[in-house]
From Swiss-Prot:
It comes from Ectopseudomonas mendocina (strain ymp). Belongs to the pseudouridine synthase TruB family. Type 1 subfamily. The keyword Protein biosynthesis does not apply. One of its GO terms (biological process) is mRNA pseudouridine synthesis. Responsible for synthesis of pseudouridine from uracil-55 in the psi GC loop of transfer RNAs. Gene3D superfamilies: Pseudouridine synthase, PUA domain. This is tRNA pseudouridine synthase B. InterPro entries: PsdUridine_synth_cat_dom_sf, PsdUridine_synth_N, PUA-like_sf, PUA_sf, tRNA_psdUridine_synth_TruB, tRNA_sdUridine_synth_fam1_C, TruB_C. GO terms for molecular function: RNA binding; tRNA pseudouridine(55) synthase activity. It catalyses: uridine(55) in tRNA = pseudouridine(55) in tRNA.
Amino acid sequence: MAQVKRIRRKVDGIILLDKPRGFTSNAALQKVRWLLNAEKAGHTGSLDPLATGVLPLCFGEATKFSQYLLDADKGYETVAQLGVTTTTGDAEGEVLERRPVTVGRPEIEALLPRFRGEIKQIPPMYSALKKDGQPLYKLARAGEVVEREARSVTIARLELLALEGEQARLSVDCSKGTYIRTLVEDLGQLLGCGAHVAELRRTKAGPFELARTVTLEELEAVHAEGGSEALDRFLQPVDSGLQDWPLLQFSEHSAFYWLQGQPVRAPEAPKFGMVRVQDHNGRFIGIGEVSDDGRIAPRRLIYTGA
C-alpha cells in the first residue's frame, strides 16, 4: 500500500524556541516544523548542541527575513570550567590538559576589560565555517588543523556573575559571529590555567529574550491535545524580529506600486538605512532601503494574497 504523503500547512511567523541541550539547531527546527505541519521553515543561525536558549524558528514568509536575525546581536550566559582544556573548547570534547587553578575573582575581573569592545578572535576548528568547501569541524574530526584568519567581533558587555569553586559564570552581550568557546579559552589562557565552556545558554537574539520562549515539551503537550493548529498561538508576527527598525506606513496608492517592485517616496522616511513597511491597513508588506534620491526601494516583499 502506497504511503499517503502528508499535506503541509502554510504557516507564517516565528516561534521562539528555548532549544534543549543535546539538539542540533536543525534537529530542533525539524521537530517543531513537524509539530506545526508547516510547509517552509528555517532557523536564524546555529546553536551548538551543548547550548540551550533562544532559537528563533522562522516559518513561511518569515524565512525571507531570517538573515537579518542571523546578523543581530546576541546575549549569552556561560559557565567557564577553569583548569581544564578540551579538544572542542567545550564539555563535549576530550580533555587535553588539566592545570591547577590559583586565581580568584580579582584576577578574573582584572582581565575582562581586555575582551570588551572590538576584539579579534580566531574561530575554533570545531565550527561550521568552511575551508575550501569543507566544514572545519569535519577537518578537525579527521585530525587536521588549518590556519584560520582572525575576525573582528564586538563584546558590548562582559560581566562575571559568580565564581563557584573552579567554575566562573559569565554574562556576555556580543555581535554576530562571536564564539563564546573562543572567548572562554582565551580568558583561560591569560589566567594561566586554561578553560572550556561547561554550559552555554543564549539569553537574547536581536529583540527576542528568553522570557518569550517556549520549550519543546510545551509545544509537544499542546500538540498532543489540540493538533498542529493549536500551536499557532505561539507564532510571533512575521516582522517581529525587525521591531527595532523604523516603520513606514504607505498609502494604498504607494503600496500598490511598491509591491510591484517600484521605489516610492515617503516624506517621513529616515535619510538612510533599512525600514519595514506597512500598507494603509497596517499590514506588514516587506522591507525597503532608503535610496540616495530619498525613495524607498523594495528589498524583500511578502506575499499579500492580493
